[in-house]
């Protein structure tokens, strides 16, 4: 018994070796970095998603803008076509009403060229044509300016000469050379007139010669 060897329990030297502080700190920092990387990745993905959403909305708004611009351009072109059509055919009704007047003038001219033309009939026909024209003009707001005997109005009358008159007041229209016309009160052309002016007053002279 005395000679029995004592068995010394083996121990793992490596496991009992003290841990290197530097290695421990490195592992700790690595773990922390892994833990910190996860939130950063999630945040980056969220930012990328927001960016994609913003790009999608920007594309949508851009397409809406393009459609709106195209619609405005189409409306502008339609408006221009309507204006052009309005300018081109604005006098269509007036022209249609004038055609009978032209027809009557042509018939009157043909009658005047006949060998047995009746002057009285031609005059009456001409008066009828003039009446037709005046009726057409009145329907479209054309007014005749015939200021015979009226006071001279430079807004509607054009004086081409003056004439002395002892009977008419100064600046009175004595003669209408050419009638004027207005459209709904707006002057088309002035009436050409002769206007009165005061006559020269003569005074009896005194003979101073003896």
From Swiss-Prot:
SUPFAM superfamilies: Coiled-coil domain of nucleotide exchange factor GrpE, Head domain of nucleotide exchange factor GrpE. It is found in: Cytoplasm. One of its GO terms (molecular function) is unfolded protein binding. It comes from the Bacteria. Belongs to the GrpE family. Participates actively in the response to hyperosmotic and heat shock by preventing the aggregation of stress-denatured proteins, in association with DnaK and GrpE. It is the nucleotide exchange factor for DnaK and may function as a thermosensor. Unfolded proteins bind initially to DnaJ; upon interaction with the DnaJ-bound protein, DnaK hydrolyzes its bound ATP, resulting in the formation of a stable complex. GrpE releases ADP from DnaK; ATP binding to DnaK triggers the release of the substrate protein, thus completing the reaction cycle. This is Protein GrpE. It comes from Nitrosococcus oceani (strain ATCC 19707 / BCRC 17464 / JCM 30415 / NCIMB 11848 / C-107).
């Amino acid at each position: 018994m005395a000679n029995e060897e004592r068995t010394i329990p083996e121990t793992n030297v490596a496991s009992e070796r003290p841990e290197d502080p530097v290695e421990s700190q490195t592992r700790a920092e690595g773990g922390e970095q892994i833990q910190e990387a996860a939130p950063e990745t999630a945040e980056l993905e969220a930012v990328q998603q927001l960016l994609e959403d913003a790009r999608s909305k920007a594309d949508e708004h851009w397409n809406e803008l393009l459609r709106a611009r195209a619609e405005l351009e189409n409306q502008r072109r339609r408006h221009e076509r309507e204006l052009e059509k309005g300018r081109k055919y604005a006098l269509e009704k007036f022209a249609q009403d004038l055609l009978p007047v032209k027809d009557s003038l042509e018939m009157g001219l043909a009658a005047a060229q006949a060998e047995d033309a009746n002057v009285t009939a031609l005059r009456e026909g001409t008066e009828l044509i003039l009446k037709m024209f005046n009726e057409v003009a009145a329907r479209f707001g054309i007014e005749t300016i015939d200021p015979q005997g009226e006071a001279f109005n430079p807004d509607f009358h054009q004086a081409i000469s003056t004439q002395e008159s002892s009977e008419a007041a100064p600046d009175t229209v004595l003669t209408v050379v050419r009638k004027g016309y207005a459209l709904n009160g707006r002057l088309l052309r002035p009436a050409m007139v002769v206007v009165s002016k005061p006559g020269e007053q003569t005074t009896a002279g005194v003979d101073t010669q003896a």
